Amino acid sequence: MSEELDEEVLDGLTEVEKLYTVFHGASQEDVAYAKLFWNSLSLQPPIESRLVSSDIRQRLKVAKTPNTTNAAANQAPWSKRNEEIQQDAYLRQKQEEKQRYMEMAKNRDQIIALLKKQRDERIKKEMIAYKHKPKKGKLEEKRLAPKTLSSDVDEDQKEVQKLQ
């Protein structure tokens, strides 16, 4: 019986399969059984890696038909009133926000105008001082000059803070 199995297996194999499957030092019966085993064995991927599962629970449910035309027509009058109230509140909020931004822009313009005025006054004072500045000044005059200017700067800073 083993000889018949060997002959059937060897006859069924193609030339390529005969060349690539080599069993040296084994009996013909063992070679036939090994070839039959390796030819019948096919590795399947694990269940987790399959794209589609045969499990019924995994299938998607069928989408329901939308009935939006009836829902819009059957809308209650109180819901329309509610939408109007929400729209009014939204518009009021936008108006308040716009007004707040306008006030901030106005304050910004006032601060910029004050800073420009202070800059112009400072430049004017520097031009006057430049004309009368001695070429070689004493150290005491240099020390006293920043103190007198600092009082003007403090007043200007206080005015800017009041505007903010």
UniProtKB/Swiss-Prot annotation:
Cysteines joined through disulfide linkages: none
UniProt-listed InterPro entries: HOATZ-like
One matching Pfam family: HOATZ-like
Annotated spans, Disordered: 132-164
GO CC, any one term: cytoplasm
Gene Ontology biological process terms from the UniProt entry: cilium assembly
Locations listed in the record: Cytoplasm; Cell projection, Cilium
Record bears the keyword Lipid metabolism: no
Keyword presence, Ribosomal protein: no
Family classification: Belongs to the HOATZ family.
Protein name (record): Cilia- and flagella-associated protein HOATZ
Gene designation per UniProt: hoatz
